[in-house]
A protein has these predicted regions:
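Residues that recognize and position ribonucleotide moieties
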Residues: 4-5, 40
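N-terminal first-folded block
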Residues: 11-42
Length: 90
């Protein structure tokens, strides 16, 4: 399936607050993510707690061991909601 991508304002604010090394890791992961958000290298997984809270399926991908990007898919649009540590899951 061909996706369009729409980062939210919150995603960009969190991205700009990352260290330069984390930004580099995110850029590398983004190249993979744009090809396939569910590529095995990104370890995409459903976040049950957030999915239940927002009434839609919410996913996260692993960028670094303690850095995740959270997103959902609406029709063919991948909306990247936020990026950060496990605290995003709360």
């Amino acid at each position: 399936m061909k996706y369009r991508f729409k980062p939210t304002q919150q995603f960009w604010e969190s991205f700009y607050a990352l260290s330069s090394g984390q930004k580099d890791s995110t850029r590398r992961a983004w190249k993979i993510f744009k090809e396939n958000p569910f590529d095995r290298r990104l370890r995409a997984h459903k976040i049950h707690r957030l999915s239940a809270r927002y009434g839609r399926t919410i996913y996260a991908v692993e960028i670094e061991p303690n850095l995740r990007a959270v997103f959902y898919i609406e029709h063919n649009v991948v909306v990247t909601v936020d990026i950060g540590t496990y605290d995003l899951y709360r």
